[in-house]
Amino acid sequence: MKQIRNFSIIAHIDHGKSTLSDRLIQVCGGLTDREMDAQVLDSMDLERERGITIKAQSVTLDYKAKDGLVYQLNFIDTPGHVDFSYEVSRSLAACEGALLVVDAGQGVEAQTLANCYTALDMNLDVVPILNKIDLPQADPERVAAEIEDIVGIDAMDAVRCSAKTGVGVDEVLEVIVAKIPPPEGDPNAPLQALIIDSWFDNYLGVVSLVRIKHGSLKKGDKFKVMSTGQNHTADRVGIFTPKQTDKTELKTGEVGFVIAGLKEIHGAPVGDTLTLAKNGAEKPLPGFKKVKPQVYAGVFPISTDEYENFRDALNKLSLNDASLFFEPESSSALGFGFRIGYLGLLHMEIVQERLEREYNLELITTAPTVVYEVVMTSGETIYVDNPSDLPAINNIEEMREPIVEANILVPKEYLGNVITLCIEKRGTQVNMVYHGNQVAVTYHLPMAEVVMDFFDRLKSTSRGYASLEYNFIRFDPADMVRLDILINGDRVDALAMVIHRSNIRHRGLALVDKMKELIPRQMFDIAIQAAVGSQIIARSTVKALRKDVTAKCYGGDVSRKKKLLNKQKEGKKRMKQVGNVEVPQEAFLAVLKLNE
């Protein structure tokens, strides 16, 4: 146990943690040079394409240190993006230390800061490392000072390395051995193992990644999952050296996988504790806090017969992604589907892409909404995450919208642009601190504004230098209303949205104009209206196609023409009463893209 080191790497997107982990694997000989592939740990296609890490992965390496001892390094890779902070806290719960990797050219970013504080709250030892020193713009001295200034940990003797060229990687390994404490735990106590992650394998069933806190787990042991109380047998246990390698037992302090042939997807929830079936532990380990979804959207399969496959896909995906929440929903316009809760917009995109890719589904998503707190005139408080569930205006005493505290780090030359953006998004400034070249600004912003397109616009106004990290703080009263779209007087439930009253005219006009372009012309006029309650605020009409009925009258009498035109008019009127309009899929998608 003295020779085990469990650690993870905290870093901002693009600061090089996946490359650094590649180097560590190479130096310790986890894979031969032939098998070495760039970003070994980013195993999902999506992760490679977008160049981001989404899922936590783990690797066990043997490293022969300079003091002659062989150390077992258990390295758990973590994502850097703010939407996946939950994955990060899970990875950190299994470690005793973390490497804080910072790009020596760019300096500290807001999400790194947030994850670093998470690590310090969990009492982990954080070891700073300056990466990318091979770049011409690298300035390790300035960045080291910045780490001390902003994060508040000692960084003057931080290791300088370049994961790309391999300079200083040996020193990184030595620092891990020297500065990160070995795991604590009692090998003779009853087994307690924390499930860090689970995923579904079509051949093996559920595979769980676990960290043994106390005791040990042998192959063939009967264990039970503490939250469900079910017993299972460990068919295989082992470690990843990135490849799956079987072992006979996992000892205290180790990180490895357990396969018990579980078919039931929710049999091993993430954050749960495993213990032995006979004389097991009394209490479960403190897990992770359950995260609440922040953004909800309705997701519907394009063809209704895909509904069953969609449900199975969601079940499998939710095993792997513990923060996903879903419940069935039906819509008169789109049929049956699910209402899915996400942590943020990137999470939403990734989930939708994974569903479409890994499970071959074709999906359509309604506009994302946040959860509103509604106080009714009867005095009760309800939480609404779907605009069409909002009660009638005269029953609402007060609407409250969720407010987030956003911490933005931005180079000072872009500060003005960022402040303008925050004011436009109805934000209030709380704090501003200068750290050398960077400014840390804190704003309270309505979450609805943040989830729409705030992140993209923040990046574009600051040329990509600003970074953002936000968390929910409270509900505030706000003048929010539901904007309905009516087509020929009928509400289309999938197009309803909740927005601020100051915004309705602008939004309503934009919406009806967009819809007018997309709804195909019929034989009768189609009225498209945007309404709040019973008040119509914008309207446009898709004109009818009409036949030239007077074409066969040569010269002729005007009363003859009038008769024909009136007859046509009557017919159109009758059609309008019975005709109904199909809203094409493109129209729904266009509404979502309207913010852009």
From Swiss-Prot:
EC number: 3.6.5.n1
Gene3D superfamilies attached to this UniProt entry: 3.30.70.240, Elongation factor 4, C-terminal domain, Elongation Factor G (Translational Gtpase), domain 3, P-loop containing nucleotide triphosphate hydrolases, Translation factors
One GO molecular-function entry: translation elongation factor activity
Domain of life: Bacteria
Membrane topology (UniProt): Peripheral membrane protein
SUPFAM superfamilies: EF-G C-terminal domain-like, P-loop containing nucleoside triphosphate hydrolases, Translation proteins
Catalysed reactions, semicolon-separated: GTP + H2O = GDP + phosphate + H(+)
Every tr-type G domain range: 2-184
Pfam family, one: LepA_C
GO cellular component terms listed in the entry, alphabetical order: plasma membrane
Protein name as annotated: Elongation factor 4
PROSITE patterns: G_TR_1, G_TR_2
